[in-house]
Amino acid sequence: GKDHISGGIAQTDVLGIFGKYGVFLATRWGDSGSYITSAYNIYLNYDGKGSKYGDICVKAETSDIENMPVYASIHSDNEGRLHMIIINRNWDKEGIAKINIGGNRTYTSCTIYGFDYQSPEIRKMGEVNNIQNNYFELKIPPLTVYHIVF
């Protein structure tokens, strides 16, 4: 599925799993294709300017692991940004992510980058500027990968 959204979703998901469980090394060979490239870049260059997902995994839980896995991280350099990867694997249903951020830091806004079944191009998908008490709800279209930066 290197040139299909299913491949992009699977690769994004496995990279999140590897980070969550501290996999030290994994290899891949062959042509990456458009969606596999996007899966790597959603972690390594989500804004086209070299910005990266954090290097310290933080707790992220979902009540629907089958359809909407979630991964989260922060940066060790203390820059304060929280990163969240949310995937909607569902072929035909929009997902509603009820995001409740724990910890002692207050977040009031975030920017969303992602790709979907329509295009492997990672692009800015929107912003949320009304986060209240570290909680908000986000609609995620079918077959979509979001990288949310707080």
What kind of feature is each model-predicted range?
Residues R28-D31, I86-N90, F115:
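Active-site-proximal beta-strand/loop segments in catalytic clefts of secreted hydrolases
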Residues G102-I122:
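Solvent-exposed beta-hairpin/edge-strand motifs
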